Amino acid sequence: KVKESFKVFYKEHGLYDTVEPLSDKIRPNQIFAVSLDFPILDTEKANDVVDVIEEELLTDKGLKTLNAGDEDYRARYEGDVYNRDASYHEGTVWPWLMMGYYEACYKLKRKPKILLDVNQMLEDRCIGSICEIYDADEPRRANGAISQAWSVAMAILYL
């Protein structure tokens, strides 16, 4: 019954971000529909979701929070508090989201397109730890909290 009602999120490529109101934005949230322990998508749709993530959001530092083609996309986490907060979920790259991506690839028996250079990330801003976020566009500057537990957890889980 849950699988059937979840189909309201289906779109041609990937999943809708929200259905009330309907949002066609390409965000990383959809990767969790593939990576969670109890599959809610059939294999074809799950592969479609991972394809969208790889094409639109995957970077060498993690997943973008919004695809670059969106009108609300912000390439940099910079400026005053208001501007930084506004960019937080509008493109900024989050390393911890790779947990969902790697788990989805594993479940679908797919080779991940990118393996993060964790050794480099451990030196980006705080020696021996991984920061919270990165800029969405090159060069991907390390930003946010200089030592973020969920970013480190991602590295520990997938090393």
PLM segments and residue spans:
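C-terminal hydrophobic structural anchor segments
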Residues: 98-126
